[in-house]
Amino acid sequence: MKVSPRRRARECAVQALYSWYISQNSIEEVELAFVTDQDMKGVDLPYFRKLLRGTALYVEAIDHDIRPYLDRMENDVDPIERTILRLATYELKYELDVPYKVVINEGIEVAKVFGSDDSHKYINGILDKLAPALGRK
């Protein structure tokens, strides 16, 4: 099955945001390195950039929104799960043209690709509670 350009943008954004989180480099450095080094064929590049930059720009507000729905301390959340939650929360909060059900489903699907065995269930549980709190249900 062919993966949509937006799904590819989300997958790439998760990888780049994870790199940003781990490396502590600027988002501009991470973006440049990512688009230079990775195969960006089939990626909605403008959407990738919007997700990457937007999530990085609003990361403190996003973390504040996510925090009440975590079942553990923020630093105990797996870094890839945290990154997926940040990206999906950015979309729920700031990309209002994307239906909330699509955002949740995409978060689940990206977690199936990058997360551990049960990551998608954890992501689903949090996003399902977070969406109404952000006025998206």
Swiss-Prot record:
Any one GO BP annotation for this protein: transcription antitermination
UniProtKB keywords: RNA-binding, Transcription, Transcription antitermination, Transcription regulation
Gene Ontology terms: cellular component: cytosol
Gene3D superfamilies: NusB-like
Superkingdom: Bacteria
One Gene Ontology MF term: RNA binding
Role description: Involved in transcription antitermination. Required for transcription of ribosomal RNA (rRNA) genes. Binds specifically to the boxA antiterminator sequence of the ribosomal RNA (rrn) operons.
HAMAP family per the UniProt record, alphabetical: NusB (MF_00073)
Protein name, as recorded: Transcription antitermination protein NusB
Name of the gene encoding the protein in the UniProt record: nusB
